[in-house]
Amino acid sequence: MDYLKRYPQIFISLICIASYLPFANIGFLSDDFTFLRHYQSEGWGMISSNFYDAFFIPVTHIIQLILLDVFNQNAFLIHITQIILHFYIAVLIYRIAIENLNFKPYSAILSSIFFILIPYQSEAIFWFSSIGYQCCLMLTLVAIRSYFKDQILSYCLFFILSIHSKEIGYTTPIFIYAFSYFAKEKKKNLYLLYSFLIVILSLISRYLVLGELVGGYGEITHLNFQLTSILKVIGGYFIKFFSFSRYATSSGLLITQCLLIISILTPFILHLIKNRKFNKMGLWLFIFCICILPVINLEITSINMIQSDRYGYFASVPIVLFFGSAVSFLKNKIKIIVTAISISMFFFMTILNNQKWIGASLLAENYLSELSKVLSHEKKVFLINVPDNFKGVYVLRNGVRDYLSMKNIETEIYIWKFQTFKQLNGGIQFRDKTLKEYNTDTYFEKYSSNLYDFISNCDLILYYNNFTFNKIDKLSFTIN
């Protein structure tokens, strides 16, 4: 235990390596190919077009360009970098917890380990398009540390960088004042003034680049703060982080998981209530809600599947701090047992997640490779089914046309259905001249109207099944 307290970074790094390094050979997926196509054709010239992004996050995209240049578009080395970022963020959480939030060493170390292992982080680590969430959280935590060290220039620099990595960075001043209250530090009003000026200047530059203040998915999505929506999403994230229902294979296991978590958290909560520390509970809840507000109107499919886990990357910080505090509050022998069980369970769940990412990568690689082999001189090709996701992990919701463009294949592609693959050898079967779905769910249709007009103008109809493409005769093509 003494060794753990003296060298926490070593222990945290070993857990991070064991959890993620074996899976770093995951390739590029979905939206990655869109960015890669523009990078291949324009390189750093993408800056003049705001990187073809509806959001204004230039710092993230500049970091992406640097990584693509330095590592020559090697996905393995890029994911190694993302794993290192994840480790560094965990170390920052440890430092802030022990130096500024008055956590005991055991609580601080445990919080950092939980951040590494909580089984919702894989999307932010293994999807190149999600690296902005890592960059923003890292820069936000560095800005918070600068605030506590009273380094105003450093704070301003990292605050500016964080809000231009991801819009959630705008919440940084709220975090520092909330943490100041928790640490009983005197608030530094000069920081509030500088933060206000930075936000104003950032919004002006944002408007000049995007032509609007909101951007992204638009005002209807981002500014729709209906009370019912807010309560529903916050409730959804509570279910996600406090039940781990996604990993329960039966209702009995789900009940067991919930009872276990309640039994761990109850002594700590009762202690706070007994000592009338309602302000700390309220503060924790406030920080958790602030972490969710920037993504409040975005999908929360991550309760049941991996998809959209990146939206909870920020919110996982107050969660792991709370878990770390609760576990360390238990009596010594019970604490050690609960720590061992928690770390083992989180590690196992994370490995299960990462294996799905490996599957998605294999599916994307095979699909694109086989498609490239099939296409020769066709002008128009109709694709029956494109893998949208594999067990929740994005595969090729976007990117098919971008990949072919990168390979200088000029065939015009029509896509009928994007589908969820539940197993790698899923796809479509074509029996008795009828198209039937096989081990797959339709996600959405792109060309549902005048379908046969599209088909009649195509040179080739292809469907994907069991890792191979099959051709369909246009004259015999019917839909079940």
Stretches with model-predicted labels:
Residues D2-N480:
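Polytopic membrane enzymes that build or remodel cell-surface glycoconjugates and lipids
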